[in-house]
Amino acid sequence: LSVKIMKKKTKRNRERSHIPFRLNFLFFIVFALFAALIIQLGRLQVLNGASYQAMVNSTDKKIVTGNVPRGMVLDAKGRVLVGNSAKSAITYTKNMNVLADKMYAEANQLTKYLTIDKLDTLTERDQIDYYLSNPKNLKKWNARLPKSKKVAADGSKIPDKTVYQSTIDLVEKSFTGLSDKQKQAAAIFKIMSGAYQLSTVYIKNDNVTDKEIAEISEHLTSLPGINVGTDWERSYPNGDSMRSIIGHVSTEEQGLPEDGINSLLAQGYSRNDRVGTSYLEKQYESILHGSKSQTQVEVGNNNQILSSKVLFKGQKGSNLNLTIDQAYQTKVEAALKKIYAKAVAAGATTYSDGAYAVAMNPKTGAILAMAGEQNDRTTKQASDDALGVINRTFVMGSAVKGATVMGGMMDGVISPSNNTLPDTPIYLPSTPVKKSVYPVGTFGSLSAQSALEVSSNIYMMQLALREGKAEYIPNKKINISPDIFTKMRGYFNQFGLGQKTGIDLPGEAKGIEGPTLTDAGLPAVGSALDLSYGNYDAYTLIQLAQYISTIANGGNRMKPYLVDSIQQTGTDGNLGKLESKTSPTVLNTINAPKSYFNVVKEGMYNVVNGTNAWGTAHTLKDIKPTFGAKTGTAQSFAREDPNDSTSKQVETVTSSLVGFAPYNDPQVAIAIVFPNLTSDEGHYNTLLAREMITDYYKLNNISK
């Protein structure tokens, strides 16, 4: 028994001896862990404390840009055609990572102090976005979404963006719209949410009242990001004259145009920047836009702005000084309107496209005036369309005959001393007789100068036949060189007809060339003859101005231009130093002796000053100093219904004129067209030419 008791005690003592060991081992582990923790804390505090503290206090520096006013556009005498008008504005600068619910609350608060006038762009989606930016509404509608719209079939979470769209789809089914007050807040919310981080947008920049400015100024501390500032808009001190040449600028809402957005973004533009969208405003965007201001913003790790520093206050856009004197431009516009009104009163504009005129310095290419009236045949209303001078094409008729005569001499089929040709009609098989406007047999033969004076179609066709090495037998098929179109158009091109002129405006048309072959694949002889006297290919009016300038100056095809110089804006906001000045550009020089040009000039002199009864512009001979000109009348066609391309074609006439003055020292070249008249009996081309020449003389003190 005693032995058993001793064994039990020994066993019990042995079991007790294991307990302190386990406890000690456990305490050791705990001690080791605490020691490791203390060592780690010490390492963090002593070795890396400074770096972690720096991370806590870290900031991020960002560059924020701001827009500046655009440059001005001035006429040749320094008159401001386009400027900028300052106006009060309420702005919003978006902070970093601003949540929708914060903007929702701020938009609601702002409606207490200002009224948004423009709500027509507020879509149903905009209203729903505002509605769901209220956390309570978002939570309520999220709860109504079926689980399948939140969790995918495989158990994964559907992206928040997709869930939000599903929520919108659900709301749309029963959405009845917002109250008027809520729409005000929704419009503000839309602007805020559309802003980029740290960018500034305009909450309201039209018709901001003094009361709105005062109330918002009082509550700026409770309206983070909101400020009272200024904005600018394009102003036109001298009215709408030349608006179609100057072009337009987008609004902040319109922002960058879709057709150039990638290029502009690459240049540093923001999507809501205002840019030139047409003509001079677009062509010279990089000049007029200026340099944005740059502000360095320091942002803390809590995404709050800590400080800001202006690095560059920005530079207003440079200014464009145009070649156009507004006084002359206004005269040309008024004359065009007056004379077109005469055509309307006479019933000659039933199918008319309008009327166009341009004046150019033949020695430099500087545009002196550019005007256009486009006629809406449906409403019978006319509108300003000066750009029709460069982007509308018309068959101009006999006005181009100077180039035909020059081509004949350059080709060697006539010469200054040997240029008399028979003036007999051309008879082709199954084709109406090809002749001039005067009766057959009026002239037995004509010189080049006389042919220009009386506007002989026959003479020009004779030149074409000779250039094409054709043997003409009346009523027989004519074999003509296959390259006749290439040859004739090549001569025309040298003067600018059928070629882009290179004017510093976007959207210039090249012209339209008619077919050169018949259905049988042979040279279209009849069409080649029509081309010779200007009744086939279509040209722009600026091409006619370049062509007559080339005649006037003796062979230099000058590049037309509207911007004479670019001038900086001074620190006081006025004009600063000259940045650049346009130098006249010769695109090509006609390789022909002076005697060739003299032949054509003499013919154009006779058009105005000759004695032949069939002269086409003798009514202008009283203008002194005298000038040279060439009229044109083309057979043209218009659709009876302008809105139906399948409607009946109606025969019309297109009346044109080119000229240069004074004759002995050309300072101005003009081109005029009245397309698709029912009759040219009113001589509208010469009436307008009279006013354009005499007004130029008066304004520039040119006398006999």
Predicted regions, residues:
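Membrane-proximal periplasmic segments of bacterial cell-envelope enzymes
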Residues: 2-286, 292, 297-305, 312, ...
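Active-site His/Glu-centered metal-binding helix of metallohydrolases
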Residues: 42, 399, 403
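Short N-terminal helix-loop-first-beta-strand/juxtamembrane motif that initiates sensory/input modules
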Residues: 70-74, 223-227, 345-360
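Beta-lactam-recognizing serine transpeptidase/beta-lactamase-like catalytic domain environment
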Residues: 82-83, 88, 298-313, 324, ...
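Short, gly/Ser/Thr-rich active-site loops of penicillin-recognizing serine hydrolases
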Residues: 578-579, 585, 687-704
